[in-house]
Amino acid sequence: MKRIPSIRERNIVLIGFMGVGKTSVGEQLAKRLFRDFIDVDQEIEKTWKMKISDIFRLKGEEAFRKIEREMTIDYCTNTSLKVISLGGGAYMQDAIRTACLDHCIVIYLDLSWSLWKERLNVLIDNRPVLQDKKVEEMEQLFTKRQPTYQKNSFQVETDGREVAEIVSYLEEVIKLGWEIYGS
């Protein structure tokens, strides 16, 4: 039987809608906690030697979600001491969500719709799920995903906060959790 990692060893998984800052926060948080950082989307691109948008276009969303599911579950169940950033839609898959909640500390980076919408021009070209969508459709997707993101270990509001401030807050909360819950 596989040993369950202690609270200090558990991977930390960052979830939230695309473009909320999971990668930026994750990279800095990993450095602060002396852990490796894994961006699942970047790992998929490395493994498949193509952009996510090309995988969507050539293989379809269903094939991409299967790749994403297998890779994410492997990271959650077979590694420790990592900070892992998930793509915005990954956590919508039941199997991924279950693996994350059972084996990791799941942190939801929450950003309001109004502030997310301000980032839209920067995001749209690299997000296949947003291609050819109207703003109203994007808002529907944003709203639809919120209840699933609420299933987490804890949540941090990111509105009006710089990445460094979010990282410092998370480091403090995580270390406090380690003290309270021990090994």
Swiss-Prot record:
It is found in: Cytoplasm. ATP binds at G19, V20, G21, K22, T23, S24, R127, R161. Binds 1 Mg(2+) ion per subunit. Its main location: cytoplasm. This is Shikimate kinase. GO terms for molecular function: ATP binding; magnesium ion binding; shikimate kinase activity. CDD domains: SK (cd00464). Its EC number is 2.7.1.71. Pathway: Metabolic intermediate biosynthesis; chorismate biosynthesis; chorismate from D-erythrose 4-phosphate and phosphoenolpyruvate: step 5/7. The lineage of its organism: Bacteria, Bacillati, Bacillota, Bacilli, Bacillales. It is an enzyme of class 2 (transferase). It catalyses: shikimate + ATP = 3-phosphoshikimate + ADP + H(+). InterPro entries: P-loop_NTPase, Shikimate/glucono_kinase, Shikimate_kinase/TSH1. Its cofactor is Mg(2+).
